[in-house]
Amino acid sequence: VPDEYFECFLEELPFSVPGPPCTDEHVRAYTGLVPDCLIAYWQEFGFSGFGNGVAWLVDPLEWKVTTEEVLLDAIQHPRLGEGAQYIPFARGAFGKTFFWTPGYGISLTVEPARGTVFFWAPPKGIERAMQSFFTASGKEQFDFFDRNEKPMFDRVHEHLGSLQFDEVYGFSPGLRIGGASNVDSAHLFQIHVHMAFLRTAIGDDWYVLG
């Protein structure tokens, strides 16, 4: 049974798309690095989609290469040293990804479609930081907003259908190379391939927020 914090999340974004299960390897690799509550969520729900797939729990083992060699190859939180570890734990349907750093808390939000990175300030209480994230997370946290600030998930979901755990909605051409954020430009992509494509388009020009 999920804790009261994740229950709040599920009320907003119900369990929708089953993903791969959490294994003993995940538990061994990440116990002590991420909060116990996150491992409990993995064990109960696996790396699955919520709210029709607008939000996902991320498998950090499966994302290891994409995290270290693709997305974060040139990103370092200004408050953290070179050896800081960034563990992806949640993502949106359009690829926005949230990272946890052991001993710090939630550290980064990366939105590759736009080429933006947000550096989080340290939380007031690290022991509740992960639970607070899920309690406060609604659909808008994971959605993508077009140039008119209108949320796109429902329209794209209706147009393309549901995502699987290793898929992402993206735009072709990409936004950083002149593409438009509209439903007709949206496509389904294999997530790691698309992340690598977006990273190439960003080059050295990440937009820093926060």
Model-flagged regions — what are they?
Residues 107-147:
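Compact, glycine/acidic-enriched structural inserts
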Residues 133-185:
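Mixed-charge (acidic/basic) macromolecular-recognition segments
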Residues 79-81, 95-102, 128-141, 150-153:
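Noncatalytic linker/hinge segments flanking ATPase motor cores
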Residues 1-106, 163-210:
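A surface-exposed partner-binding patch
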